[in-house]
Swiss-Prot record:
It comes from Geobacillus kaustophilus (strain HTA426). The keyword Nucleotide-binding does not apply. It is a multi-pass membrane protein. It is found in: Cell membrane. This is Probable multidrug resistance protein NorM. GO terms for molecular function: antiporter activity; xenobiotic transmembrane transporter activity.
Length: 455
């Protein structure tokens, strides 16, 4: 059974988990930025094609990939309880499930993507680039999902530095193949934005190969013999993964898709408003990397303690994580209050767009507070395997409160496009409040020794 850290040591332990995860998440964000920036230097049509393709791919990956995130609390529970053979078995079954999910996405995408693109009012060349970008990227979906499984296995054992280094080394790989395939250097064909898809697929394959090497060779990972010991596919094991993973993946999909929906709805207010909205949302997403990384670290820490039946220690990690997130949110809010105009000018030289971006960033301040509460609690509840509450929170808060309220304010009042952001803030706050009550209920249940509830 894994040992717990003393109360003061829990701060250091959580930070040691958080920092590499944060670097990894920021590295992934940087790869997306590089793809867009390098495509834009090819042509405006290449940039548009990659942007359209990416907007279709990201919600699918975050939703389907979120199913595999179930492996993290499962492994951390086994690790906390000292069930090491069960870890190897769970990883093997997750690898099988990853391949099945990836194949399903490729087959469904092959049929659905042409139809979806035809329904969009796109220039024919942009549509061509978007389709072939996604087709090129599809060659990397199986390696990406296999890498996701190995990453969650490695992270759940507390070895988050391994995936940090994989991400950091993947960034130059991605940049190199973008340079070769987008612009046609080194004897490669000049593919423009389509080359971004192939470069991304190659980067996914690199990440899987690097994670496989680490799993086989690193001292703290090799004893589990993943990729060496084989088991028959087990529906019972898949059922456990899906029971935990489908609510997680659905919650992530609801969260990512609401922002995509709002971006489409803001379009009615003109190009300048869309540009300002997208710029402010981009920066807010960058700041969100901090509470998101804390959330992932808490899933691991709480999962280990819950697996070992040390519920008081798990509660201490929850309180530490929320405290850290609130402190960071306060700092981010002060930064945005003081420097929002400077941030806006990083995105545009147009004074009208910059002024609008600054106003949107004022609303982003309220994002920080809600995210600082909701994100760590989401991670903690996943660590407890309390995933249904996270699912219902995302569905009701974003689509039941946030979007309807945002539409009403945007279309029926003078708030305009800012009404959508007010709706998002209300949704985030509702979700944070709901999750807070749910976490307190989990604590009370474990204090009294009652059985878990379905909701």
């Amino acid at each position: 059974m894994a040992t717990t850290a003393p109360p003061n040591g829990k701060w250091r332990r959580l930070f040691a988990l958080f920092l590499p995860i944060f670097v990894s998440q920021t590295g992934q964000y940087a790869m997306n930025f590089v793809d867009v920036a390098m495509s834009g230097h090819a042509s405006a049509e290449d940039l548009a094609g990659v942007a359209i393709g990416s907007s279709l791919w990201v919600p699918v990956f975050t939703g389907a990939g979120g199913i595999l995130l179930a492996l993290s609390p499962i492994v951390s529970h086994h690790f906390g309880a000292g069930r090491h053979d069960s870890i190897t078995r769970a990883v093997a079954q997750a690898l099988y499930l990853a391949v099945a999910l990836a194949v399903a996405i490729v087959l469904i995408g092959a049929a659905a993507v042409p139809f979806i693109l035809k329904q969009m009012s796109l220039d024919e060349n942009v549509r061509h680039i978007a389709f072939h970008y996604l087709r090129a990227l599809s060659f990397g979906i199986i390696p990406l999902f296999l890498y996701s499984v190995l990453r969650y296995f490695i992270d759940a054992l507390g070895q988050t530095k391994v995936t940090m280094w994989i991400t950091l080394t993947a960034l130059p790989v991605n940049m190199l193949f973008n340079w070769l395939l987008i612009y046609g250097h080194g004897g490669f064909p000049r593919l423009g934005g389509i080359g971004t898809g192939y470069a991304t697929a190659i980067t996914y394959a690199y990440c899987f190969a690097a994670a496989a090497f680490a799993a086989l060779k690193f001292r703290r990972l090799a004893p589990y013999r993943v990729l060496v010991r084989f088991y028959r596919p087990s529906w019972a094991a898949w059922k456990e993964l899906l029971k935990t993973g489908v609510p997680i993946g659905s919650a992530i999909f609801f969260e990512t898709s609401i922002f995509a929906a709002v971006t489409l709805l803001v379009g009615r207010f003109g190009a300048e408003t869309v540009a300002a909205h997208q710029s402010a949302l981009n920066f807010a997403s960058l700041l969100y990397m901090i509470p998101l990384s804390l959330s992932m670290a808490l899933t691991i820490a709480v999962g280990v303690e819950a697996g070992a039946n040390r519920y008081e220690a798990a509660k201490q990690y929850c309180l530490i994580g929320i405290t850290l997130a609130l402190a960071v949110a306060a700092a981010a809010a002060l930064f945005l209050s003081a420097f929002r105009s400077h941030v806006a000018r990083l995105y545009t030289n147009d004074p009208t767009v910059a002024a609008l971006t600054g106003k949107f960033l004022l609303y982003a301040i309220f994002f920080q507070v809600s995210d600082a509460i909701a994100a760590p609690i989401q991670g903690a509840l996943r660590g407890y395997k309390e995933v249904n509450a996270v699912f219902w929170s995302a569905l009701l808060a974003y689509w039941g409160v946030g979007l309807p309220l945002g539409c009403a304010l945007a279309l029926l009042t003078a708030a305009g496009a800012f009404g959508y952001w007010i709706g998002l803030i209300a949704g985030l706050a509702t979700g944070a409040l709901f999750l807070s009550f749910r976490l307190r209920a989990v604590w009370r249940r474990h204090d009294s020794g009652r059985a878990p509830c379905a909701f």
